[in-house]
Design a protein with these regions (language model features):
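Helix-turn-helix
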Residues: 25, 29, 33, 37-71, ...
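Short glycine/proline-centered loop/turn elements that form peptide/ligand docking sites
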Residues: 2-20, 32-36, 45-47, 55, ...
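Short acidic/histidine-centered micro-motifs embedded in hydrophobic/aromatic stretches
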Residues: 122-126, 141, 175, 179
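All-alpha amphipathic helical-bundle segments outside canonical DNA-binding/catalytic cores
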Residues: 100, 137-142, 159-175, 226-227
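Amphipathic alpha-helical segments used for helix-helix packing
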Residues: 101, 115-137, 187-193
Length: 227
């Protein structure tokens, strides 16, 4: 076919310029290899050149699809978190009937983490760690969109008498989020020690168990002498 190109070290099917429709796989490969390198080495220790080389393409493709390295990682997190954001927003905007809607949020959150097992490690390394490079952006773009909305929903449920009158909705939100995510953070220990495998039918059972645990802890009491 075409004579060898003397300008750029080539990937087998890569040519300079705008990617074609078949190059959607390139975008996914960049996300996949970028995620793996980030988890292995940390955000500050990985270059766009390294990510591109691992994906078998050029740094120009990172700039084309994502703008820069931060944009690539932002897209990676958005793809995982957006269904959860949508679920919380929908719950906030509708009257709902209390507990079943909260269970839907818990289900969305836990399924999101189960489907993206890299997510807890990324959050610990790049958000929770003192030197995490993505903490500010994660708070601004994701946490700030879900946590206040979740608190508002819990406050509404309390005011409508479905949750205990003395319940602090902020504390309840922290408890709900912790119940949903910590089992996956601790999986490297609970997996081999307890045989915990949150997948398939076991994941469904565990989600139901967690939702029941939360519900019974926050629900309004009907017996006299309780609030």
């Amino acid at each position: 076919m075409a004579a060898p190109n003397h300008q750029t070290p080539q990937s087998p099917t890569r040519r300079p310029g705008r990617p074609t429709g078949g190059d959607a796989a390139v975008r996914e490969s960049l996300l996949e290899h970028g995620r793996d390198l980030l988890l292995q080495h940390g955000f500050g220790n990985v270059s766009t050149r390294q990510i591109a080389a691992a994906a078998g393409t050029t740094p120009a493709m990172i700039h084309y699809y994502f703008g820069d390295k931060r944009g690539l990682y932002r897209t990676m997190i958005e793809s995982a978190v957006q269904p959860l954001i949508d679920s919380v927003r929908q719950l906030e905007q509708t009257a709902g009937d209390g507990t079943p809607d909260l269970e839907a949020v818990m289900r969305a959150y836990m399924r999101m983490v189960a489907a993206n097992p890299w997510f807890p490690a990324l959050i610990i390394r790049e958000v929770l760690d003192q030197n995490g490079r993505m903490r500010g952006e994660f708070i601004e773009r994701f946490a700030a969109k879900t946590a206040p909305a979740l608190v508002a929903v819990l406050r509404r449920e309390r005011e409508q008498g479905r949750l205990r009158a003395g319940l602090d909705p902020r504390f309840a939100a922290v408890s709900l989020l912790s119940l949903c995510v910590f089992p996956f953070v601790s999986l490297p220990i609970t997996g081999p020690v307890l045989g915990f495998r949150p997948e398939g039918a076991e994941l469904d059972r565990f989600i139901s168990h967690t939702a029941q645990l939360f519900r019974e802890g926050v629900a309004a009491r009907t017996e006299p002498g309780h609030d």
